[in-house]
Each structure stands twice: as C-alpha cells, then as structure tokens.
C-alpha cells in the first residue's frame, strides 16, 4: 500500500485500542510564526474538542516550511504532560530532516496511540469512532 494508506491504517489500528482520536493535517506552509498556534486553530475549527473524554490529538505538518506540531485536548494532555509532546515533535522533525515523512507519522501515531491506550483504553460498550480517520490536506 501507499504511504497515505499506511498512515490511515496506523490511525485505525491505534484507535481500535482506545477511546482517543488521532487526526493528521498536512499543508504546504504555516501562516503562523509558531506551528502550535496553527495546530490549535485547526484543532478548534475541526471541532476536535467535542470528543467525550477530551482525548483527541491533532498532528500538524507544514511540508515546505518544515514545521510540525502536536495539539492535544486537555484530557490526554493532563495525563502525559508537555515533555511527551515535545519528544514526539523532536522525533518527527528528525525523521523529516532525512525525508522519512511516512516513518515520522507512523512512529508518532504509534506513540500517541500507546499513550491514549494506557490512559483511555477502548470500551466496546461505550466507544465509537468520533472523528474521521482520514488525513486532511490543506493548501
């Protein structure tokens, strides 16, 4: 399968173990100085704050600007803390420098999925897929 299909499959695999949600937004350029500000804007505009447990995570990538950010809702952020997200961004940036884009996304999806699983395990009686698993492409 292609890289896009592999990334979407990784999101689905991660979400099968947790009530948490993972989304990816990719665009060419970041119009903000800090990519985290852009990720936050997208998080809210995509209504990712509406998950039941406030455990959605947005992985943001601006390809041409070589910028990445991860924005997480308060439910998961309070569990794992700022250092976790910083380490994930550093790992993604390292892969991106070597043009290993799919590997970067697959690794962060796996790590975030594991954190979501630990703190928000899947419950077949109450959990449903609250957000689409597709990759969102901006301009």
Q: Could you describe each region identified by the protein language model?
A:
Residues 1-17, 22-124, 128-130, 134-138:
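Divalent-cation
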């Amino acid at each position: 399968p292609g890289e896009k299909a592999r990334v979407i499959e990784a999101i689905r695999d991660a979400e099968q173990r947790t009530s948490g949600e993972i989304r990816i937004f990719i665009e060419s350029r970041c119009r903000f100085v800090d990519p985290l500000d852009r990720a936050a804007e997208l998080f809210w505009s995509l209504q990712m704050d509406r998950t039941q447990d406030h455990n959605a995570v947005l992985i943001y990538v601006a390809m041409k600007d070589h910028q990445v950010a991860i924005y997480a809702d308060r439910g998961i952020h309070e569990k794992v803390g700022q250092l976790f997200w910083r380490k994930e961004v550093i790992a993604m940036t390292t892969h991106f420098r070597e043009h290993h884009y799919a590997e970067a996304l697959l690794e962060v999806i796996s790590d975030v999925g594991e954190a979501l699983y630990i703190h928000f395990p899947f419950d077949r009686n109450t959990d449903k897929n609250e957000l689409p698993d597709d990759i969102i492409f901006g301009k």
